[in-house]
UniProtKB/Swiss-Prot annotation:
This is Uncharacterized protein C11orf71. Disulfide bonds: none annotated. InterPro entries: DUF4687. Pfam families: DUF4687 (PF15747). It comes from the Eukaryota. Residues 1-12 have a biased composition (Polar residues). Residues 61-82 have a biased composition (Basic and acidic residues).
Amino acid sequence: MALNNVSLSSGDQRSRVAYRSSHGDLRPRASALAMVSGDGFLVSRPEAIHLGPRQAVRPSVRAESRRVDGGGRSPREPDGRGRSRQARFSPYPIPAVEPDLLRSVLQQRLIALGGVIAARISV
């Protein structure tokens, strides 16, 4: 199959692509590829090309209100340290581990392990 399409991304053929596209000589697939690859200005009509400066995009009101409300990064304390992190709200209760329960479970396991070791030594 012969390739009749010109390469739209190589810099040395841009003038040829612009000439062919301005005369409507590009195939629909080639022009679609140019649009997707960012070379759409090569496919558009010469009078449709605007080389002026882009207008600055106004930040959204939501982003501005977040800055006003103190969202984003938390301000630092006067001594340079960041504020301590607050725990996130969770609808599920966080189980509190009772130290006595933990101590008794660990003690039982230690006694059981000691019994196994003593049994192996005695054999």
